[in-house]
């Protein structure tokens, strides 16, 4: 387990679009040193950008690595996924040990969007992983800062 905990790790997720309220996005990043960076920009009703940074315990980082590893996202390829478009884009970059992978696709509203793609199984894995990571990040941020992230 000590070797697993010392494994190189980095994860960055971004989802956003440029619309009538400007550049609206959600982005978070887990770093190997335990830092979690979070940014949420919504210009709706003149909201301002929310930026938060916290340091996580090794146990939380280990859980994040487990979530990524068990999702098997590192075996996927985004070549047959929908290209980012005017509706928006999602990016996911992961470094886990000696593996480094980066994905870019359009925004996914629901599982129906996954089923209509050329790679429904791969996109479904991506969709569920992103949902799990967002849930984890929102919980960590709201517990730490006592704010509502969205």
From Swiss-Prot:
Cysteine-cysteine disulfides: none
Against InterPro entries, the record matches this protein to: Mago_nashi, Mago_nashi_sf
**Per the record, what phenotype accompanies loss of this gene's function?**
Male sterility due to pollen abortion after meiosis.
Compartments annotated for it: namely: Nucleus, Nucleolus; Nucleus speckle; Nucleus; Cytoplasm, P-body
Q: Which residues carry this modification: N-acetylalanine?
A: 2
The processes (GO biological process) annotated in the record are:
embryo development ending in seed dormancy; mRNA processing; mRNA transport; nuclear-transcribed mRNA catabolic process, nonsense-mediated decay; pollen tube guidance; positive regulation of gene expression; regulation of translation; RNA splicing
Keyword field contains Transferase: no
The alphabetized UniProt keywords are: Acetylation, Cytoplasm, mRNA processing, mRNA splicing, mRNA transport, Nonsense-mediated mRNA decay, Nucleus, RNA-binding, Translation regulation, Transport
Pfam families reported in the protein's UniProt record: Mago_nashi
Note whether Nucleus occurs among the keywords: yes
Q: Which family does this protein fall into?
A: Belongs to the mago nashi family.
Q: What does this protein do?
A: Core component of the splicing-dependent multiprotein exon junction complex (EJC) deposited at splice junctions on mRNAs. The EJC is a dynamic structure consisting of core proteins and several peripheral nuclear and cytoplasmic associated factors that join the complex only transiently either during EJC assembly or during subsequent mRNA metabolism.
Q: Quote the PANTHER family the UniProt record gives.
A: MAGO HOMOLOG, EXON JUNCTION COMPLEX SUBUNIT-RELATED (PTHR12638:SF0), PROTEIN MAGO NASHI HOMOLOG (PTHR12638)
Q: What is this protein called?
A: Protein mago nashi homolog
């Amino acid at each position: 387990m000590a070797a697993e905990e010392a494994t190189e790790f980095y994860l960055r997720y971004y989802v956003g679009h440029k619309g009538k309220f400007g550049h609206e996005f959600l982005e978070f990043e887990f770093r190997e040193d335990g830092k979690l960076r979070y940014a949420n920009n919504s210009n709706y009703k003149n909201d301002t950008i929310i930026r938060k940074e916290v340091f996580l315990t090794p146990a939380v980082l280990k859980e994040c690595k487990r979530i990524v590893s068990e999702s098997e996202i590192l075996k996927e390829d985004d070549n047959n996924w929908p290209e980012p478009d005017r509706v928006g884009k999602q990016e996911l970059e992961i470094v886990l040990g000696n593996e480094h992978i980066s994905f870019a696709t359009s925004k996914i509203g629901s599982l129906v969007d996954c089923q209509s793609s050329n790679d429904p199984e791969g996109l479904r894995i991506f969709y569920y992983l992103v949902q799990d990571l967002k849930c984890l990040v929102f919980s960590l941020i709201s517990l730490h800062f006592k704010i509502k992230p969205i």
